[in-house]
Amino acid sequence: MAITSVIEQMRQLIQLIAKHNHAYYVMDQPTISDSEYDHLFHQLKALEEQYPELVQADSPTTKVGGQALSKFESVTHVVPMLSLGNVFNQEDLFAFARRVEERLPNQKVQYEVELKLDGLAISLWYENGVLVRGVTRGDGETGEDITQNVKTIRNLPKVLHSEKYEIPRLLEVRGEVLMPKSGFEKLNADQEAKGEKTFANPRNAAAGSLRQLDPNIAAARPLAFYAYGIAQCEPNHGLTTMHDSLQWLTELGFQIAERQYLCNSIQEVQQRYEQIQQERPNLQVEIDGMVVKVDDLKQQQQLGFLSREPRWATAYKFPAQAALTTVEQIDWQVGRTGTLTPVARLNPVFVGGVTVSNVTLHNIGEIHRLDVRIGDTVSVYRTGDVIPKVEKVWPEFRPAEAEVVHLPESCPVCASPVVMPEGEALARCSGGLYCAAQRIEAIRHFVSRKAMDIEGLGDRWVESLLRLDLLKDVADIYHLHEHRETLLGIEKMGEKSVQNLIDAIEASKKTTLARFIYALGIRGVGETTARMLANTFQTLEALKAANVEALKKTPDVGDITAEWIADFFLAPHNIEVLDRLIAAGIHWDAPTAPTRQPLNGESWVLTGTLEQMTRDQATQMLQALGARVSGSVSSKTKCVVAGEKAGSKLEKAAKLGIPVMNETDFLSLMAGYGQTLS
């Protein structure tokens, strides 16, 4: 058979299978029988086996399997994957609507209602219609590259097709990966038959499947992808509503959740909620509520965002599922900052698809409020079907020997005195960095990516080093090279892994003052506050010497945080650890000029492909000068930095008269402020 004829036959089969996949998975209207579909699939596979050099990139047979990975790479989301706010009752729902409508005076508001799928949110990138990347939500800012695994999901298009619409140059689609109930039941039956561990619920099964380093395992699992939104589209799709956007996605080959409703009032939204709640048991997928969105995309833009969630959408959760059990014990756990948290150990009980045996009681005040005692019968429920919580204590079932719970006087880990300042709800161990419980959490935080970024020093290493008494505090990390022979004796730690660890520790010594401050794990000091402190005080010595009043003048530092920072630097054992860290060689570039925040409060946007720097580098330079980097252009945008292939954001900037800067000019501007690529 001629090569051109083979390719033509392959293309015909691929297009035919894609058409039937769309009819089956997206439209839920199969046009051929399973046996006919299998015949087409095997016909294509036979051709590919005969002519492996001609296999097409978008062939459905290439979706399954691949080489196992050693780890997942981190990816920064260009547009953050924000979470949704929650409402749990009609009163909260109506309050959400009031807030929306107050910000949109004299405008008609329609609401798009969708099922809130109980799966894992991911982001898919398509370039010229071809899937190039799949990324987990992660912390909303950074996720993990799971491209090889998402390519194994059968209903997920690898190449976009549409007879009606032009395929965009760049498209980022957000959606949920989950395991339908029927597939979950079959998977568990197969696991049980093989004598292997079963999964507690479909969400756990889906999560476990996506997290497999070997894509062949993911390929064998019955996963499905449901699209729920568009993060980026270049050129702009020109659609005006959420409802139309979802229909547009189906035209491109994506499956969306089986129910969407366009509601003209919030009262109609409530009616749909009650309807969906009744239909929940009959759905093919697990849901934990519904998502309510303002339908008009222009109105969404007007409403904007809070720090972690959009103002134009909320999740309306179903009532939590509850069960009765007994409190067997109440233990006190010590966290990274020394906070003592009471944890109720329960007689294990099955609630909402998972077995619950531990529930946090938050603080001694919550124990007193509930009047919970060891031996009590309690109602346990899962907030939003996720976080277990004690809802109620049943005193009528209380045994005579039930024990009242008191706040311990000394730390259960290091025996240091427990302190609880007047007016605070949380008790703390006063042992600081010498408390073993605080130590392990402090070390985990210290080595994390956004702190000192010591690659390879994970939990297994940390636990082994603590057992061997090689880590008493974070400063000991920088003396591990003195114990090379001991390190080589740790199980599964060979010459290469030990050398890699030592090299990573050495590399981490060159850092920034902001990262170092963040790494110290001072209570109330996150990344942004650490950056503000570094910009304000410029040197560690100046920060250590600062009093509460000086600290309070720092942007992003409130009265309480100022006291926490001052207390940290007044503790002798903390100063001792700091001195040892500096003596070990941790350093950063000295400030070359007084602190400047020339872009303070400005909103900047990055778009297109940057060739001379990464988006992370550009973002860090802007943030160092006080600017905020946004994922969208608005009238409040100060400037747009445009790389190659910039699309809709550039068009919008032109419409609004927002200044646009190319990459070279941006780097020149940054250099003028003392910001250069490192």
Swiss-Prot record:
Its cofactor is Mg(2+); Mn(2+). InterPro entries: BRCT_dom, BRCT_dom_sf, DisA/LigA_HHH, DNA_ligase, DNA_ligase_AS, DNA_ligase_CS, DNAligase_adenylation, DNAligase_N. Its EC number is 6.5.1.2. It catalyses: NAD(+) + (deoxyribonucleotide)n-3'-hydroxyl + 5'-phospho-(deoxyribonucleotide)m = (deoxyribonucleotide)n+m + AMP + beta-nicotinamide D-nucleotide. Pfam families: BRCT (PF00533), DNA_ligase_aden (PF01653), DNA_ligase_OB (PF03120), DNA_ligase_ZBD (PF03119), HHH_2 (PF12826), Nlig-Ia (PF22745). One of its GO terms (biological process) is DNA repair. One of its GO terms (molecular function) is DNA ligase (NAD+) activity. Keywords: DNA damage, DNA repair, DNA replication, Ligase, Magnesium, Manganese, Metal-binding, NAD, Zinc. CDD domains: BRCT_DNA_ligase_like, LIGANc. The active site is at K116 (n6-amp-lysine intermediate). NAD(+) binds at D34, S35, E36, Y37, D38, S83, L84, E114, R137, E176, K293, K317. The keyword tRNA-binding does not apply. The keyword Magnesium applies. Residues 594-678 form the BRCT domain. GO terms for cellular component: cytosol. It comes from the Bacteria. Zn(2+) binds at C411, C414, C429, C435. HAMAP family: DNA_ligase_A. Belongs to the NAD-dependent DNA ligase family. LigA subfamily. PANTHER family: CHROMOSOME TRANSMISSION FIDELITY FACTOR 18 (PTHR23389), DNA LIGASE (PTHR23389:SF9). DNA ligase that catalyzes the formation of phosphodiester linkages between 5'-phosphoryl and 3'-hydroxyl groups in double-stranded DNA using NAD as a coenzyme and as the energy source for the reaction. It is essential for DNA replication and repair of damaged DNA. NCBIfam families: dnlj, PRK07956.1. This is DNA ligase.
